[in-house]
Amino acid sequence: MLRNRDYARGRAQVESYGSAPVIMYEPLSGRHGNFFDPAYSAIAVNPDWMRRFDKVHAQAARSLPLPQIDSTRRWRELDSSMSSDALLMNVFCTPEVAKSAAIRSALGVEDSAEPIFGWKARVPLTNGRFDRTEVDMRLGSLLVEAKLTEVGFQTRTAAIVEAYRDFDTVFDHDRLPRAEIATSRWMRASEFPENASQEFESIVADPAVVSNVDTIFRPPGEPGYAAYQLIRSVLAAYAADCSFCVIHDERRPDLREEWFQIMAAVKSAALSVRLKILTWQELAAHLPEPLQGFLDVKYGIVSPGKLPSAIGASAELAD
């Protein structure tokens, strides 16, 4: 947060409310504080890319002040300093990056197609329909999931995950990480029905030990799966005959471990070799120097063997 706060100085932005604030940037005079200038210029003239700004920030009404420049403008997800989609577009919308032979080699992509952001995968379900899966990016035959600061890869109930047509074909169920999905709020003991609260009767009935403390419980949840986003994306890659890569920050080994768990549960060797992992730091080594400087100052992302610049070094990028 300190790095983002320093980078934000002199740019059109506000800070969210709460104990874990984020910086929200506004567009101004053809520039956007959350974006590398050449990337944003390329986005602005590409209607498909610009359409990504249609996604309104879901928490804006209760967690964000009004924009400073245009108070009628609604905050977008891509305005957030914590947006992994913004980071992804900063990299791949910068001219010549997606066509770079070094980048294609790092990603294992042979064709030089234009990036598609928010690609609709239409993963088939057992009922003959398709889900509304949106993959962060498709680059030729490669699907990409981008991560920055997100907590994890979400969880879903078993009923939802097992409703995908190819779930049994692709995965060994027993090797997938499980999770209990909460289906109701935490409850106090006094709210439980008679047959569920009898264990407290011996205490409650004794005035000598009665207490004002009302024990809190969470009723059992539904069985589910962890890393749902990864499971879904692997199924999308299988259905579309694509490869799939997770790009994450090397400072997040927890995300890497989650991905390894999912890869280990894939049955097919032919599909397994199409599943990849890459860090932003590894990718940075192949990027143009000006973009590397932007990633360093704004995100603290530098190529392997280098140290991030000191906080306070952002003045040279301000204009």
Please place each PLM-identified region on the residue numbering.
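Active-site metal-binding core of divalent-cation-utilizing nuclease and nuclease-like domains
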Residues: 113-140, 150, 186-193, 222-225
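Conserved catalytic cores of phosphodiester-cleaving nucleases, focusing on short active-site segments
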Residues: 137-150, 209-212, 233
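Short catalytic/ligand-binding loop motif for oxyanion handling, primarily in non-cytosolic enzymes
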Residues: 151-155, 253-256
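Short, flexible loop/turn elements at secondary-structure junctions
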Residues: 93-95, 123-125, 139-141, 147-150, ...
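Nuclease-adjacent, charged terminal/linker segments that flank catalytic cores
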Residues: 1-127, 309-319
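Acidic, metal/cofactor-coordinating or nucleic-acid-engaging core segments within structured domains
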Residues: 157-239, 243-244
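Non-catalytic C-terminal interaction segments of nucleic acid-processing enzymes
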Residues: 201-205, 212-213, 219-319
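Short, well-structured alpha-helical interface segments that form or flank functional binding sites
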Residues: 82, 86, 90, 129-132, ...
